[in-house]
Each structure stands twice: as structure tokens, then as C-alpha cells.
């Protein structure tokens, strides 16, 4: 799917500007992964996709997509095998806006996970789409 390369703000101002080096890493990852939007998420879940929130623990605790598993970006490579997730499972990753999840998706692909998707727009997109969330 083709999504914009500019951040989707959903009517909100981003808290900070990202550095050019970080954005370069994100763009490199985005060129090699699949992405979806929040509007696609319900159908993906209905078709068996596992949703993983890669934000920090405090972000997850403040609210997350209902049914999402939490594995932070900083530990996902180390901890994903602690869960019953196979290399062929469809996995949708999200973060705050789609940047961290893109990097994590590329990392999981490099580990052999073949059906990983990053949610472009992330948590902000989930909220804007009015999807079910919980704390």
C-alpha cells in the first residue's frame, strides 16, 4: 500500500521534530516493508492478524488498541520468541505515528518474519479512526 511519506498528524501537532538521521532510518525501513492505515486494521484483525504495540510501557498503559499485545520496540527482537508467534503469522505493528513500528517491522523481517505490516499513522490513526481502545 502506498502511504504518504510525511507524518500524518490527524489534527494534532507532533510533540517534537524528528532528527534527519532518524527520519532517514525510517524511510529506509519504509522502502522495504508493507504498511497499512488504521482504516485497514479491523479487516486485518478479522482475518487473523496479531496486533503488537511497540510503544513504551507507559504509552501502552495510558491506552492501546483493544487486544493488542505489548512488546516494546527496544526489546522486540529479544522478546518476540517468548510469545506464540510463528514466522508466517500476519503481524501488524503500531507505535505513536508509524515511525518506530516501521523500524521494528524491518527488524522482524530481517529475523525471518514474512508477513509483518507497520500501521502508518499509529496510535494517532487508531484514535482518529475511532477504533476500539482500552487501558
Across the structure, where does each feature detected by a protein language model lie?
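Rhodanese-like catalytic fold shared by cysteine-dependent sulfurtransferases
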Residues: 2-50, 57-90, 97-135
